[in-house]
Structures are given as structure tokens and as C-alpha cells.
A protein has these predicted regions:
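C-terminal structural segment of proteins
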Residues: 1-272
Length: 272
């Protein structure tokens, strides 16, 4: 049964400072923007939050640019923005590839990278990309700004270090050297929740991150080190299998995830 929205309240800030002040003075509030996940929860009657902060019209959280040779992506950049951005396609093509895999066109037009990250689902398609890219999450409150390495942002299943008075305002991605790679495996070819999702960089400093396998997205430093040493593919696959602890859930089994992850690693290393 769909949940009623009549008992819920929505605050509508006109600027980022206004939003941060509301979080400080009128919280707790749940930030929202594209609402692609919120509406699903509302329709299924599982939405627990009752007070929301509308970020959708805050221009300060939009935009994609380069500052001091660092790619900066506003938290309200939509997946369509990521797909179309020449800067993203040039500097972080694996993020554009991930954005193409998220839902249908309507979800891509409304869903934001900040929402995908804040939702903290281990199956989020952009998460392995940001982990493999050594991205920085920029958090802001009325008291100031914090920059958190993406790999330190998640503390558990759907849990993050973001405080109640903070907003994700941007992501900072340093230059990447090497061939970037992204793949997602789901129940069907499109509009599917990931069973396994991998992003990586093949080069002098290999990088590999995997999602929808453990309670949070993870980097695989032992597998990265094996790739850097130049061992054969089978050995790197063995290292990967020993490094992950896949979960069983309604979407897949641990054994399936283990085998798929190893196969995807082989495809990444072969350039497929």
C-alpha cells in the first residue's frame, strides 16, 4: 500500500547557505533531490522519514568542471549530465559508462550522483567508479567543509560518515592514468539492479573496486597488487576470490558473485 504524503513536510531552501542553516536549526531533515528512490519507498509504503529538505533547485550543487587539474562534479549532477559531459567522457569515461546503466531515461534525467552515493546501497552503479577513481566526497555544514576519501565514506550497510547537519556538495576526482573499465551484471541487460558491478583502471597503478558483493563497495588492494606484479590472469583471479566475502541475498548467491567477479576481472585485464 502506498504511504500517504499528507503527513510529511518539505522545506524548500532558496540557496545552499539557507539549506545548511535549515539542517542546523530545524533538523533532523532528510535531503532529497531527484527522488527516484524516495518515490519507490513511498509507493511501497516503506518510507519512514517524515521531514525533508528539497535540494533540487540549488544551483550551487550543480555543474561539472576542472579546478587545479581536478575534476569536480556537483552533487546534483544528474546521470544524464554525466553521460553528456565532455569532461566526464574525457577524464572519467567509466563514470559515464556507469551512468548509462542506471535505470531508464527518466531515472537518468532525475537521479543525481549525490543521491546515488548518499543512498548508500552497495549496488549503486556509480560507487565502484568513485572508489576506483580515488574520489573525494566534499561535505559541507553551516560550521564548515570536510573532505572524505570515498573509500572511507561508508561505515556499513547503508551507513556513511555524513553527519545530520551536513550535505554532500561535490565530488573531486584527481587525474587518472591508465585504461578505465566498467561492467555491471544484473538479471537482465537493462534497468536491472546489479548483482555484481566492477570498475577499474589498468596501468602502472592498477585500481579495482567492486559493488553489490559485500555490505559496502570495496577496493581490492591485494588484487591490485597482483596485477601490478604482472602475474597471470588466473593468479589474479585467485587473489580476488580470496579477497572478497560475497553475500547471499534475494538477487544472487555468494558463489555466483564470486565466479562472476573473477570472470569480469579476466575481461578487464584482456581489454574486453
Amino acid at each position: 500500500m502506498a504511504a500517504s504524503i499528507s503527513s510529511r513536510s518539505l522545506l524548500d531552501p532558496k540557496s545552499l547557505p539557507d539549506a545548511l542553516k535549515m539542517l542546523r536549526d530545524e533538523g533532523p531533515l532528510t535531503p532529497l533531490a531527484g527522488c527516484t528512490d524516495l518515490y519507490v519507498s513511498l509507493n511501497f509504503g516503506t518510507l519512514k522519514e517524515s521531514r525533508f529538505l528539497n535540494l533540487w533547485r540549488l544551483a550551487a550543487l550543480r555543474g561539472i568542471g576542472v579546478r587545479r587539474n581536478t575534476l569536480t562534479i556537483g552533487a546534483l549532477a544528474t546521470h544524464t549530465d554525466l553521460i553528456r559531459s565532455p569532461l566526464v567522457r574525457k577524464r572519467l569515461p567509466m563514470l559515464a559508462a556507469a551512468a548509462r546503466e542506471i535505470g531508464g531515461v527518466q531515472s537518468q534525467n532525475r537521479g543525481t550522483i549525490g543521491g546515488n552515493v548518499a543512498n548508500a546501497s552497495p549496488a549503486g552503479d556509480t560507487l565502484p567508479v568513485l572508489a576506483a577513481a580515488d574520489a573525494i566526497v566534499v561535505l559541507q555544514s553551516a560550521a564548515g567543509t570536510r573532505r572524505i576519501p570515498f573509500t572511507a565514506f561508508y561505515t556499513g550497510y547503508r551507513q556513511t560518515v555524513r553527519q545530520a547537519d551536513e550535505l554532500i556538495v561535490a565530488f573531486e576526482i584527481p587525474p587518472i592514468s591508465g585504461r578505465q573499465w566498467f561492467r555491471k551484471v544484473g538479471t537482465r541487460a537493462a534497468q536491472a539492479i546489479s548483482k555484481v558491478v566492477i570498475a577499474g583502471v589498468v596501468g602502472k597503478q592498477p585500481r579495482l573496486a567492486i559493488g553489490s558483493v559485500e555490505p559496502t563497495v570495496i577496493r581490492l588492494p591485494k588484487t591490485e597488487e597482483s596485477i601490478a606484479r604482472g602475474v597471470d590472469v588466473a593468479e589474479s583471479q585467485r587473489v580476488l576470490i580470496s579477497e572478497i566475502a560475497p553475500i547471499d541475498d534475494i538477487r544472487s548467491t555468494a558463489d555466483y558473485r564470486r565466479r562472476v567477479a573473477a570472470n569480469l576481472l579476466a575481461r578487464m585485464l584482456s581489454g574486453d
